[in-house]
Amino acid sequence: MMQRCWRLTVPLAKRGLAVVTHTRQAVVSDNPEAENLDGFEQQYLKERIEITTFQRMLLGAGSSIAAILDPRRHDMIACLGETTGEDALWNIMDTMHESEEGQRIMVEKPRIHTSTIDFKRLESLPADTFGAAYVKFLKDNKVTPDSRMAVRFLEDPKLAYLMTRYRECHDLIHTVLDMPTNMLGEVAVKWVEALNTGLPMCYGGAVFGAVRLRPKQRRAYLKHYLPWALENGKQMKPLMPVYWEERWEQNVNELRAELGIKLLNKV
């Protein structure tokens, strides 16, 4: 049965992607408000893929099934986030405007990848700083900030930036939570992100990711990781308005205390 679903789902998702590809077009030149857009927004409007409501539903359904069957399909997970997350992103936008830090992020639109971050400087920082902890996380888990997929299906360029920001900050959230990138760590982080951002894809990743845990992992998850994630997700401050790039030199434990984060006592 699972194989049959997979044979139906993958073509469905691919068909949805194929259907919308031909509608890609540059809209900036014909938009009278384009001159008020910043560089990120103008570039996004040139590269976005415009889709209809039906196509959005098709992509949402296909990508959700594909992501459930194979959580390693990051392309399907990314697609799911964009086709289901618009309402949550508008709520995040409101949160961004409630703080000076969040407002500056929306104006400056910083990016996190190897061409924008001086990783050599971060490596030289004291071990107890957030920047040093981030570099250590990347090395220990063999991940890179350059692996995030570009946003393509959101209509509003400001929401597209918020989704981009969420993706690029994912490893920073792992760092501040002191969670690895194994399945157990990812599920725990997804619960925190779900409660903190309200993004449907985070709830989906948390629920369906937990189903794939091995028996020993599931016991640890139910006894320790899930209660910890739910507590943190409910009590911590919003993470999206944090200007992480300005916190590199901050003591990582002081940053956690500021955000209301309690670390899990590893067992």
UniProtKB/Swiss-Prot annotation:
Q: How does it assemble?
A: Component of a multi-subunit COQ enzyme complex.
Catalytic activity, as annotated: a 4-hydroxy-3-methoxy-5-(all-trans-polyprenyl)benzoate + H(+) = a 2-methoxy-6-(all-trans-polyprenyl)phenol + CO2
The enzyme's main class, written as a single word, is: lyase
E.C. numbers:
4.1.1.130
Record-level GO BP terms: ubiquinone biosynthetic process
Q: Which organism is it from?
A: Drosophila persimilis (Fruit fly)
Which top-level group of life is the source organism from? Eukaryota
Q: Which amino acid positions bind Zn(2+), per UniProt?
A: H170, D171, H174, E186
User: Membrane topology for this entry?
Assistant: Peripheral membrane protein
Which keywords has UniProt assigned to this entry?
Lyase, Membrane, Metal-binding, Mitochondrion, Mitochondrion inner membrane, Ubiquinone biosynthesis, Zinc
Any additional notes?
A: This protein may be expected to contain an N-terminal transit peptide but none has been predicted.
**Function description:** Lyase that catalyzes the C1-decarboxylation of 4-hydroxy-3-methoxy-5-(all-trans-polyprenyl)benzoic acid into 2-methoxy-6-(all-trans-polyprenyl)phenol during ubiquinone biosynthesis.
Q: Which cofactor does it need?
A: Zn(2+)
Which locations, inside or outside the cell, does it occupy?
Mitochondrion inner membrane
Q: What is this protein called?
A: Ubiquinone biosynthesis protein COQ4 homolog, mitochondrial
